[in-house]
Regions:
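Short regulatory alpha-helical segment in sensory/regulatory domains of signaling proteins that mediates
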Residues: 45-53, 57, 154, 217
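N-terminal helix-turn-helix
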Residues: 1-38, 218-222
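Extended hydrophobic
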Residues: 128, 136-225
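Conserved segment of winged-helix/HTH DNA-binding domains
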Residues: 23-51, 71, 77-81
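Short, solvent-exposed recognition segments
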Residues: 78-169
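A structural signal for short hydrophobic beta-strand segments in well-ordered beta-sheet cores
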Residues: 10-11, 58, 180
């Protein structure tokens, strides 16, 4: 492992947590389709971020959860648990709900079956797992919805076209996300923001994100409506 750290393929922080290193991330950025997606999306993330000046992020669904591909943040923005190349919970975040709601049915069902033991459970949030102190306002333990509740939430997201989650990971934050559709019409990614829970402008956030998502979809050659 030390050799990988020296080669910048891995990095170890002061708490001993090992993460992908800069060189590994750069190598992935040049080759992975998801990184091509992130590059296509970046101008639209910048546009959203310039309006809201909080956190704007792009994510995809993989076997283990919600993988964050890109994040833009402004100084003084509300707390946000997302890290680039890190993962977020799939059942308690706006990004996760959008990705599951707009995934192919078989993909969503397979994912739910794989993680069924997490549904209806109260789980430790990752700051505790990594041995770090939990910042004020960050929930140390997160309750996931039951399977019937999850399915109702996903139906709501499909009907409304976006997901909004208040205070699931951070008490003062609201996550809002929309799908970015690929050529097959299903979600290739999710575009989301984290904003203050009581922000007066939140009703305008879904239309803003939908406009940006359509632009990304056009860039990908996908569905733009």
């Amino acid at each position: 492992m030390d050799r990988l750290v020296r080669a910048e393929l891995l990095q170890k922080d002061e708490d001993g947590v090992v993460r992908p290193g800069l060189r590994l991330w750069e190598m992935a950025s040049r080759s992975a389709p998801s990184m091509s997606l992130a590059r296509t999306a970046m101008p639209f993330l910048v546009d959203v971020q310039s309006v809201l000046r909080q956190h704007t992020q792009l994510a995809v669904l993989d076997d283990d959860g919600v993988l964050v591909l890109a994040r833009l943040s402004s100084q003084g923005a509300v707390v946000n648990q997302a890290d680039v190349a890190g993962r977020l919970p799939p059942f308690t975040t706006a990004l996760g709900l959008v990705l599951l709601a707009h995934a192919p049915v078989e993909t969503a069902e397979r994912f739910i079956a794989r993680h069924r033991d997490r549904l209806g459970a109260v789980v430790d949030h990752h700051p505790l797992e990594s041995g770090r102190a939990v910042p004020a306002g960050v929930r140390a333990r997160v309750a996931t919805p039951s399977e019937p509740r999850l399915r109702a939430l996903l139906a709501d997201v499909r009907r409304e076209g976006y997901a909004a989650v208040d205070g699931a990971l951070d008490e003062e934050s609201r996550g809002v996300a929309v799908p970015v559709r690929g050529a097959d019409g299903v979600a290739a990614a999710a575009l989301g923001v984290v904003v203050p829970r009581e922000a007066p402008y939140t009703p305008g956030v879904p239309p803003l994100l939908m406009t940006a998502a359509r632009g990304i979809a056009r860039g990908l050659g996908g569905h733009s409506h």
